[in-house]
Structures are given as C-alpha cells and as structure tokens.
Amino acid sequence: MNDKIVIKGARANNLKNIDISIPRDKLVVMTGLSGSGKSSLAFDTIYAEGQRRYVESLSAYARQFLGQMDKPDLDYIQGLSPAISIDQKTSSRNPRSTVGTVTEIYDYMRLLWARVGVPHCPKCGKEIHQQTIDQIIDRLMQLPEGTKLQILAPVVRSRKGEHVKVLEDAKRSGYVRARIDGSMYELSETVQLDKNLKHSIDIIVDRVVIKPDAVRRITDSVETASELAGGLVVADVVGSDEELLFSQNYACSDCGISIEELTPRMFSFNTPYGACPKCDGLGMQMLIDPELIIPDDELSIAQGGIKASGWTSAGRETISGMYYAALAEKYRFSLTQPIKELPSEAVNVILYGTKGEPLKLHYDRANRSGSFSGSYQKPFEGICNNLERRYHETQSQYMRAEIEECMSETPCKACGGRRLRKEALAVTVGGKTIAEMADMPVGNAIDFVDSLVLTPKERIIAERILKEIKQRLGFLKNVGLDYLTLSRGASTLSGGESQRIRLATQIGASLVGVLYILDEPSIGLHQRDNDKLLATLKNLRDLGNSLIVVEHDEDTIRAADYIVDIGPKAGVHGGEVVCAGSVEDICACERSLTGQYLSGKLRIPVPEKRRKAEKGSINIIGAKENNLKNIDVSFPLGVVTCVTGVSGSGKSSLVNEILYKTIAQQKNRAKTKPGKYEAITGLEGIDKIIDIDQSPIGRTPRSNPATYTGLFNDIRELFASTEDARIRGYNAGRFSFNVRGGRCEACKGDGLQRIEMHFLPDVYVPCDVCNGKRYNRETLEVRYKGKNIYEVLDMTVEEASEFFANLPKLRAKLDTLLDVGLGYIKLGQSSTTLSGGEAQRVKLATELSKRSTGSTVYVLDEPTTGLHMADVHRLIHIIDRLADAGNTVVIIEHNLDVIKIADHIIDLGPEGGDKGGTVVFAGTPEECAECEQSYTGQFLKKLL
C-alpha cells in the first residue's frame, strides 16, 4: 500500500496547479493565512475526491440518496482512503437532536432502562412488580398451613358508575358473591350503586385452605381470577386484615394505573410511544410571554409600553384604545402612568382578562355619513389569551410571525422539559430516571455508571450495555466536553463543541484505515484542555488512520508529524505550497509567515500601556442564567474586556444571554428575552450594542460583500449617474441583479442555470444567454472608466480600491475591507462561499466604515476562529481602533494573543458545567497572571 497521498495539478478555487505528497497514517496539519487555500486543498480536493470515489463504488440506486461530490479540479491523485470530514458547519439544527442522541449514548441508555429498569406508579410513586402465576402460587403456599383464603378478582377499582353490566356478567358466569366497597353482597340480590361515586368491586372466585394437596385447586382459582380482572388477583386472608394483591402486568394496585412492558422505544422522545403528548417530545413549548408584551415597564400604555400585535395603540379611535380606556375606568388607573406603577390587579387584567366580567366600552366614531357614539358591555379576554387564540385561528403567515415576536420557548408543563411521557419517567435504574441521567454533566454520569449497584442477574444483562455507555462517555471527557449534559440540544452547541462530539463518536466507531479531515478542532477549547484533544487525535492516528487537520493553534502545529504551509498570502496571492515538513523546516523557511511566528521572528507585542476605565461601567447584579452562580460582574466602558475561562464555565451565558440581550432589548428595542439576572446598571452612557459573530452575512448566493457593506448601492448610483445611463433613462435599480429590468431574465440574475441529473449531482452551468454575467446586454453596455457593472463586481477589493481611488465615499468602505485583511475577496463573491472568519471580518469592516458614536458596545464571540497568527495581529489593530474611538469591546476568547492585549479580564470558572459559573478573577492581564486559581492566568504568565 502507498505510504503517501500524491496530488498533482490541484486547481480548486485559488490553488495554483500545486503538486504535493502527504504522508499517510500520520497527523498532518495544514496551516496558512485565512483564505490562502488550506480548505480548498483539504476539503475541496482531498476529501471531495476520497468521498466521491467511495460513493462511486456503490450502486446507482444507492448513489441517488447520498448526494455526490463534484469531481475536484486536479490532474491526478493516488493513495486515498475513504474520507470522513469533521467540519464545523454540519452541527444539527434539529430541535430533537441532543448530545446523547448524536453520540448514540442515549440509545444504550434506553436499552439499559428497558432491560433492568424498575417501574414505579406515575401517580403515587410506589414500586410496581410483575408476577407470573407460578410466582403468585409460590407466595401463597408460603403462608402457614391451614390458612383460610378468599381468592378475589378485582374487576372494578375506584371507578365511578353503576357497573350494572359488570355485576350481571358475573352473575351469568355462575359467581355467587361479590365484595363491593368493602361489604359482602349476594349477586342474586339487586345492588344499587350511586353513579356519581367511585366504587371498587371484587368478585369472589373461590374459598380455599392452604395445604399441600390444594395446589391444583388454588392454581385454577388464581388463573380464573386473573383472567376476570385483567391480570390482577387479590388473596384475602380470612380472619385478619391481611390482603395480598398480585399483578401479572406492570400495574399499580392502589391507583389502578398499568404501564406496558418496558421496551427501548418507551424511552425515546422521538416516537409517539415515549414522547410527552403535550410537547411531542421537544421538552419546550412556544407560549405567549408577558415580558415580551411589556419589554419596558418604564413607559406608559399611552407611550406605547405594550408591544403586541393589535394592542400597541391607546388612541380612542382604535379597538385596543377602547379596551384600555374601559379598563382604566373600571380598575382606576391612568393610561399615562408608567406600567410599573400600575396596581398588580390592573396589569393582571390587561394580560389575562376580566374572567367573564363585562366591561363598559364607549365608542365615538365619525365617517362620511356623520358621527355616532354610544357604549356596550363586553368581557375582555386579556392580551395573552387574545394573542394565543389568534395565533391558533389565523391562516396568515404574516400574522403568525407578528404574534411569534411575543412568544418565547418555555419548558413544557406536562413533562417539566424532560421530553418523555410520565410512564417512562417513572422507571428508575440505581434510583435515577433516564431523564435525570441525561441531565447530568458527562463527568457526573461516569461516576453514576461506576457506582451502580445491580443484582447478579441484572449485572449479566447490563454488562455490555454499561461498557458501551462508559466508553462513549469517556471519549467525550477526553475531548474536554465533560461539562456538557447528554440532554443538551445539539443546536445550542458551538462549532468547536459539535466538531469534538463528532470526533468522540468517530473514536467510538474504532475504524481503521480511514482518512479523517478536521477543521480547527481546537476552537472554543481552553489551553488547559488542549492536551486532551491532541491525545485524542494521536489515538485516532495510532489506530491506523490518516489525519489531516486544518489548524492555526500553535500547540497543534507543534504536535504534528508533518506540516503543510499554504500561502504565502491570501486569495489570489495564495494557493501555493510555501513549505512542507517538520516544525523545524517551517521555522527555517523565510517565505513562511507561519514559520516566522513560530520561530518568534514575528510576534504580537504586549501593549506598552493599557486603557483606563474612565467612563464608568456596566454592572450586572445577580446573574443566574444556566450555570452562573448568582454572580455580580462589571464591564468597564471605553476599554477592551476579555471574558475567559475553560469551556462550559458560563462565558456565553454571561455575555450573549445576559449582557447582549438585555442591552439589545433596552437600547436597540429588540424583542429578545435576556437570561436570568437581578439588575443591570450603567447603561446611560451607551446608545446601542452590536454582536459581530461568525454567522453568514447572507443565506442566499445573491448576497455578497458589496451588498452587505452598502458598496453595491454606491456602485449602482455611480453607474446610474454616467452620461450613457442618463441618455437611456436608467436609474440605480437597473443595475441590480435582484429585480426585473437590468438582470438577465433567463437565469433571473443568478448567472448560473441548474441542470438536474438523476443518479449524479446536479450540474450548474453558466447561463448561455448572459454567459454567467447576470445582466442583460443593454445594461452591460453602460460603462464607467471602461468597465461594466459585471466587471466591477468581479474585481477583488484590492483592485476596486485602486479603481475607485478618486471617490472618497467608495474608497473609505473599500479601505476598511483592506484593513481587516480581505483584499483578496471579490466584491460580488457569493456570501455562501465565505468562511465564518471572513463573514465576521466583513461585518467588522462595515462597522469600521460607519461614523463612530463612541458609545457603542461591540460583542465578539471567539473572533480568532479561522484566523492565522498574522490575521489575529490585524484583528487586534481593528479592535484597538474601535476602543480608541471610545467604544466598549467585549470579547469571549481563548486565544492568548488577544487576551494579553485586553485592558480588563473577567475569568470565569474554575471548571465547566456545575463546577463553573463563578468569577475567578477580574482585573488587568498582569494581575491575572499572578492569580493562582486562574487557569487562564497560568498560561498568560508565560507570555507577559
């Protein structure tokens, strides 16, 4: 077998016809600037071809379900294995997907609870046992010899009704007596039962005496009673109060509730057999949220303090205004009073109605026929009930979307957010229900499995299941995810977390001879846990697999067996193999930027002095969201603050859920529901908050950097102002590819046409009318400085900056894109082709190009994702520019180069999950380095 993957003439995206040999069965790291072509080589060439060849070996029928990769643009490749890609984009958005289901641990848990679980009554909590006829007889024969018994069939247990048919059937079957509500009756007499009361009826099947030769008779009687009562038998010991109840089913003798036989599907929230019927197994329900109806209680109703579809206006001429006036009159409050000063009874009535009590409504209308006024009486249903009713009745998507703005996800009241029906939640293993184990952090779940006490019989049944569960939990712990719970929704995980979960799942699969391609697995991981991740990667390699990791993290690069540095720069200036070999080879290479940072020739300096917080601070008091332990935190204004801590310590809960959502709600008038906290102060000096994350700048291929930054509007105005356009009567709309007029109608302005290929991937070909140029011929005839609109959109930012050098407005926006290191992207490049890091930098550039108010709070969540050390250097300059203008920058980050340039650090921890959520340290980086309790400080000390 080849010991190398040999590639010749790779030309995907910006790759410049490169030839390279990569060793197999090794840990290979590909590095280089953002946009240099690493992903083009790793994913679009090696993975695409490995996957395509594997899929091509399957039947045509199977291929149509798998979705085939396009053949990459290259001359030759050999030495490939079947390829598995673990990137960051494919984390599930399905609300049914959890950490437990993704890793398959939950499937083994379902099997465990079905095989060795102990059922309890969902109503009274009493343990339920199932017994066979033989077990019942054995128990009865243990009674002292000579004991007199009555064998009864409990046909009715605490049910309302006259039960005439039950008694008639028993009489017809030859039974003579029955015990009704504890008293004996002859079935020959007429028994009158009150149909409104609950009754219990036991038919007397036989009277027996316990002795060895009576076994046959007792067995027959027990079988008969069981048949009559659907598996239940009562043995009444004559002359004493003792009564034995037996069940052949899982049924509670006291409550009469029976549960079906335990099966794995009973514990699945994705099947009707196990899912909570109220929330269909989602654990959450969308309900009207009063906090979103009254987002700011400092305002009065007259000032528009109520923000709900159909209820915003307090004007007398509107229906809502009529109701408000009537409510104010009846409950004695003023519509100009701030809502927080209204009596609680009044607020309650506004939200939940008058409970059938009529209100006196006055109307005063005027139209062409004249004016008319009067009054009438009508109860008020309340805003919450009104929105709920309209939401379920309306057919209008617009109306539903409007009402949804007042709704939030609330844990289901029936199952308490645990997704399962009550019968499944009443089964325990080791005293815990399946939902309780799913809610444990991985570390605690390992302890629980280790400490399980089982009977010898249960141990034999559960041995293999427990081994699988423990092994998979161990893999999650090894990739630094021991703070996650198995019930955590997959859609709430960060890119790095979901990637490491899939990595743990792959190790669990124990495949050999596979080519794994990973995209920055260290994202979101604290330096403390990096060693665990590297050990996991080496473990995969040692099993006999080849690993190609696209990575910027210094520890990972240094741990690699072989490094491929792509560059030297980004975009059109990249796409070459700058250097390949060991760490020493890379460090010795003059052309390699990576080598220069690794060797220390280039580095990000520690700032000579740090900004002082002179504008006050934002203070959050009593933060309790997720695992935050009722903490008080201050964010100084006008400086750069880094929020650090190990994975799962509560950084996102504090910054994204509380700080961002609260300020967005109060300053940006956003309809967001912040996380739990007591109070927030210090917002007077802020005008808005902006979250610059790595989500795409647009969801469709039609959106691009030019449309996002506003450049496209300026360019279209420029073309519309040319003499040629004015003669033809073209306005700016003519130069848009999104609307009729100037666009090519054959491809609707896409530039491409899709051709459906059955059994093969769909083929996109350039439109044969416009040749992929998106516009019709007349529009393309209009030129500015010799270029038409298509040619301008096809320019890189760098080229456009020179082209528009004498237009200050355009030049300013282009320069900010250059400043953030995006000179290589094209103005019209589809936003779907941009990486997360590139999308974030387009957003940063857009913010930089706006006039700064000096009172904005910027939130950046791990902005160094996908960035090379040189890109991080550039990012730091941008962050400094934002802060130097007086703005406040709050960054969640693990990258030490960014942490060391911060003016203020808030370190959360000390651990993740339950053991996190407290403030370990707050102060300058220098002070943090001296804090022994801070993991971040320990790593920071080496850099300062």
Label the predicted regions.
Residues 1-944:
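Conserved phosphate-binding elements of NTP-dependent enzyme cores
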